[in-house]
A protein has these predicted regions:
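Short amphipathic alpha-helical patches
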Residues: 119-121, 142
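Structural signature of tandem-repeat unit edges
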Residues: 2-15, 22-40, 52-91, 101-114, ...
Length: 142
């Protein structure tokens, strides 16, 4: 996991939904849990350059304990090149990677079972979707 990573998140059924990621790495490895909640969802437009307004219950958390001012740069849009999701992520919401034109790869675990619409719209460099699972492990793929 990245040592310098800030995350805007909210509680959701079963754990935490990541709404926005901040830091200096174009290839973040997202945390397995946030404040004791397992990360189970990636929210709508999470990595999109332009985002809709955030919900009132959104909270900020960082790996190193620094506040939001220490993370002025979102990992979004043309900056993001690859993302490693925690193995427990079950859902990728609509347009989570919308207009991430330099996104080359995404690594997800076998818990993934729901993928929203327009997830990879305009992700022209995307050439690898890595499903990190044992060959005989059950996956959400149908």
């Amino acid at each position: 996991m990245n040592s310098s990573l800030g995350i805007l998140w909210q509680a959701c059924p079963g754990g935490a939904r990541i709404l926005r990621v901040f830091g200096d790495s174009p290839c973040p490895a997202l945390p397995v849990q946030i404040e004791g909640f397992p990360v189970v969802e990636i929210g709508p437009y999470c990595f999109a350059q332009n985002q809709r307004s955030q919900p009132a219950d959104a909270r900020f958390w960082s790996v190193d304990g620094r506040g939001p001012a220490a993370y002025p740069h979102p990992i979004a849009g043309d900056f993001v090149q690859g993302v490693t999701l925690p193995a427990g992520v079950r859902a990728l919401h609509n347009a989570a990677f919308y207009n991430c034109r330099k996104l080359e790869w995404l690594c997800a675990g076998s818990a993934l079972e729901s993928v929203g619409s327009d997830l990879f719209t305009n992700c022209r460099a995307l050439d690898r979707f890595i499903l990190d699972a044992a060959p005989d492990a059950p996956t959400g793929l149908k």
